[in-house]
Amino acid sequence: MVGLVGGGGWRVGDDAAGGGGGGAVAAGAAAAAEAEHMRRLHSHAPGEHQCSSALVKHIKAPVHLVWSLVRSFDQPQRYKPFVSRCVVRGGDLEIGSVREVNVKTGLPATTSTERLELLDDDEHILSVKFVGGDHRLRNYSSIVTVHPESIDGRPGTLVIESFVVDVPDGNTKDETCYFVEAVIKCNLTSLAEVSERLAVQSPTSPLEQ
Amino acid sequence: MSSDTSRRDHAAMAVREVLAGDRKVGTVSRSARRRRLELRRLGRTASAVAEDDAAKRVRPASDSSSDSSESAKVAPEPTAEVARWPACVSHGAVSVIGRRREMEDAIFVAAPFLAASKEAAVEGSGVAEEEGKEEDEGFFAVYDGHGGSRVAEACRERMHVVLAEEVRVRRLLQGGGGGADVEDEDRARWKEAMAACFTRVDGEVGGAEEADTGEQTVGSTAVVAVVGPRRIVVANCGDSRAVLSRGGVAVPLSSDHKPDRPDEMERVEAAGGRVINWNGYRILGVLATSRSIGDYYLKPYVIAEPEVTVMDRTDKDEFLILASDGLWDVVSNDVACKIARNCLSGRAASKYPESVSGSTAADAAALLVELAISRGSKDNISVVVVELRRLRSRTTASKENGR
C-alpha cells in the first residue's frame, strides 16, 4: 500500500513524468520547474561532516489544503505519523517559536525540540531547526516548500522538502542521508494521504484554485 | 525516587538470594541468619513494591492467575508410562507498564483454547475424538506493540480466534490412519496454520483505506505458544521470546527477529531495504525488529511471517516462559529459567516466605517481572509462565495450601 518501496519518484528530477500524461515536453517542463524551485529555495551549504538532500512529492490536492497542513508548526501530528504529541512554548506562533515534540515508541528517539525559522504564507515556505531532543540529528535544518501544479488536468501540489544535518559518529554520510530520507518519505506519503482525503471531503470551487 | 530505587535494589537482592539459594546448603551459619533477617525486612519492602507497582500498574492478566490455582488442584498427575502430558498444570501471567509512559504490551491466555469455538465445528465421524485432543491444548501469547497499542490489542483480540479457525480447517481435512507420515503431516499443518493465522491478522490490522494518520506506523511483535499433550508449537514474529526449561536447562523455542541477524539482514537487503545502526541496528534506521504484525509503512522489508518451532514434549519439560523484550533485555534465558524453577519448586517461597509469596506460575511470572524492574528495564514488561510438570513436592504443596 504505502510502503517505501524502491527508489523512483522521490528525488528531484527523478519523476519527470510526475505531472502525468503530458508527454516528454510537459515532463521536461515539470522537471525544469522543480530544478528552479530547488535552486531558488532549497540551497543548503553542507559542511565537511554534514549531509544534505531533497525529496519531492506530487499530491493530488490543491495547494491551500496542503499548505494548511504543512504550515501548522504547532500541530505536526496532523500529518506526521511518528509524532504523538506537540506543545509550543509560550503559545503564540511566530518566528523563533519552539515546539516540544514527543515521538511514538519503537523509534530511535522519544523527544525533539524544534524552532520555527521561517514561515512565509505568500511563498509557502516553512523552515525548522532542531535545537534539542534525544535523537541523533545535530544541527538539523529543514525547508519545506509547496507549489501549485496541474496533475491530470486537476489542481495538484508539488512539495519539496530539503535538509542538512551533521553526520553522527559511527555513521557514514550515506547512512545518515538514507535514514533521514526514510523518515521524510514517511512524512510526505502521509501528507499526501491526509491532503488527498481532505480534498475528497471538501472539493474546492474553481475560484479557490 | 530514591526510596523507590532502594526498594528496587532490595527486590533485586531478594532475587539474587533466590538465585543463590540453589547452590547453598541449609546450614544456618551466622551470615545465613543475618541474610534471613535482612530478607525479612525485604519481605515488607518487596510487598510494598508489589503494592505500588503491581496493584497500580499490573494489568489484570486475564483470569489466568486465579484460574491457575483452580486448575492446579484438579489437574491429573502425569503418569510416566504414557507419552501424553496434561497440556499444562497451571499458568500465570503478569504484564506491567514499567517505566514507560504508555502501555503497549498485551498478553492473552486461553486454556483450553479450541473448545470456545466448538460450535463452529462441522459435525461428522471422527470429530469427537479430535475434540477430545483439542480440549487439552492451551494458547499463550505475548504481544509487544510499538507506535501505539492498537495492533497489540488487535492481536490480543484476534490471534487465538483466527488460529482456532485455521487449525480447525486443517484438522477436519486430516484423513484417518496412523504412522510416521501422520506425525510429519501434523507438524506441517501446524506450521501452515500459524503462518496463515499471522498473515490474516496482519491483513486485518492494516486494512482500512481511510486509516488515520499514524495507522501505517503501528505494529506489534507476537510470540504464540500452543501447548498440547504431546508437543509444544511456538510461532514467533519479532523480538519477544519463548524459552522452555527442560531438566533445568533453558531451551529457546524462538529466535529473535533482529535486523542484524545475518539471515534477516540478507532478506531485508534482497527486498531493497537497508539495515542501519542508528541507536542499535534498525530497518531503514527506524525500526529495531525485522518482523512484526502491522507496520505497513515498512513493508516489504518488515514481514509478518512467523518462524514456527514444533517441539515434542519429554518428561523432563518443566515450564515455558513467554516474555517481551522488557524482560529479555535485562535477564538471560538461563537466569529467567533458574528464577522460575526456584519459585515453582517452592524452594523460593519456603526459604523467603515474606519476599516470595508462593509457588504458582503467577508467582513465578511476578518474580521475573520484579527482577526485570530491579535490573533497570525501561520498557513494558510482560511474562507468561506455563507450568508443564509439577516441580513442587506434595508435602511442600500441602504445607503451602494449609498456610
Curated annotation (Swiss-Prot), chain A:
Motif (Gate loop) on chain: 105-109
A GO MF term: protein phosphatase inhibitor activity
Induction, per UniProt: Repressed by abscisic acid (ABA) and drought stress.
Annotated S-S bridges: 51-177
Record GO cellular component, one term: nucleus
InterPro entries: Plant_def-hormone_signal, Polyketide_cyclase/dehydratase, START-like_dom_sf
Signal peptide (UniProt feature, chain positions): none
Main location: nucleus
Region (START-like), start-end ranges: 44-196
Quaternary structure and partners: Monomer. Interacts with PP2C30. Binding to PP2C30 is dependent on the presence of abscisic acid (ABA). Interacts with PP2C51. Binding to PP2C51 is dependent on the presence of ABA. Interacts with PP2C50. Binding to PP2C50 is dependent on the presence of ABA. Interacts with PP2C53.
Functional note: Intracellular abscisic acid (ABA) receptor that functions as a positive regulator of ABA signaling pathway. Together with ABI5, PP2C30 and SAPK2, is part of an ABA signaling unit that modulates seed germination and early seedling growth. Acts as a positive regulator of abiotic stress-responsive gene expression. Inhibits the protein phosphatases PP2C06 and PP2C09 when activated by ABA.
Misc: Plants overexpressing PYL5 exhibit abscisic acid (ABA) hypersensitive phenotypes. Plants overexpressing PYL5 exhibit tolerance to salt and drought stresses, but are hypersensitive to osmotic stress and ABA during vegetative growth.
PANTHER family for this protein: ABSCISIC ACID RECEPTOR PYL8, OS08G0374000 PROTEIN-RELATED
Protein name in UniProt: Abscisic acid receptor PYL5
Swiss-Prot record, chain B:
UniProt record, GO biological process: regulation of intracellular signal transduction
Binding site for Mn(2+) 1: 144-145
One GO molecular-function entry: protein serine/threonine phosphatase activity
Superkingdom of source: Eukaryota
Enzyme class name: hydrolase
Region (Disordered): 42-80
Keyword field: Hydrolase, Magnesium, Manganese, Metal-binding, Protein phosphatase
Annotated cofactor note: Binds 2 magnesium or manganese ions per subunit.
Record-linked InterPro entries: PP2C, PP2C_BS, PPM-type-like_dom_sf, PPM-type_phosphatase-like_dom
Pfam (any one): PP2C
Listed PANTHER family: PROTEIN PHOSPHATASE (PTHR47992)
Record-stated family: Belongs to the PP2C family.
Protein name, as recorded: Probable protein phosphatase 2C 8
Species the sequence originates in: Oryza sativa subsp. japonica
